[in-house]
Amino acid sequence: MPERKGIYFVSDVHLGLQVGDPAGREARFVAFLRSIPAEGTRALYLLGDIWDFWYEYRDVVPKGYVRVFGALTDLMDAGVKVYFFPGNHDVWAYGYFEELGMKILQQPYVTEIGGKTFCLGHGDGLGPVDRGYRILRGIFHNRFLQACFSTLHPWFAFSLGNGWSRRSRLGKRDRYVFKGAGEPLYKFCASFNDQRTASGEPPVDIFLFGHYHCPVDLPVGPSRLLLLNDWITQSDWLVFDATAGTIDRQVVGWDVPVL
């Protein structure tokens, strides 16, 4: 049996977003999942916003995505561990993903893979973000407000959720340009390493997030910051080889080594 040395990372697929070709995007994502060699793969990390709007009721989950869940469960049945980080669009998962066999993780999550220390997450809300966004994020994560939202009929609730998404920057197809050291996430990474150094721990080797919808590969002191692109116009994921210690970015079938 081949050694399980492959670790895959993907984010911001935004399944269900009514921009571009939603059915084609879902088909591309299913094809990606089916292309993962299960016998040689250790884990798949879903770094948030896989769904454009996901909200679970106690006894009801959103319809659709049957082939996506089928492909994910096939991987898990074959021994691949699947980890899910809630993003700002699919934060409202209350047990269905775990019922399927996924493990839910919260950012920032530090783990060692193949001798390298990773810090993982979706990337939203990390660092000194503006007050308005902190308030919005607090609303999304507030248990009382979530309980209130659950009293709405799903037709109305999903109409609100999908309408909010269409009015967002993503719905308008605005492209974000990452501003390097001036970004809150960059400052978070630098501060995170400072805290680790102060406590006698080594710095992180690789910070890996999504959320910003632009591919980034930047040094942060002794570390490397990698951001995944979204799936709106192309397919983008990263593959880490735990034996060789290398990580490659895969984009629409062709790969660019980044480490």
Feature map (PLM): residue ranges:
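Core catalytic region of metal-dependent phosphoesterases/phosphodiesterases
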Residues: P2-G6, V10, L15-I113
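Residue-level detector of flexible, active-site-proximal loop/helix-junction positions
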Residues: H14, H89, T111, G127, ...
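Hydrophobic positions within alpha-helical membrane elements
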Residues: L17, W54, W92-A93, G127, ...
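Conserved beta-sheet core of the metallophosphoesterase superfamily
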Residues: L100-Q106, T117-C119, D124, P128-H141, ...
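Active-site-proximal loop/helix segment associated with metal-binding centers of metalloenzymes
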Residues: G123-S191
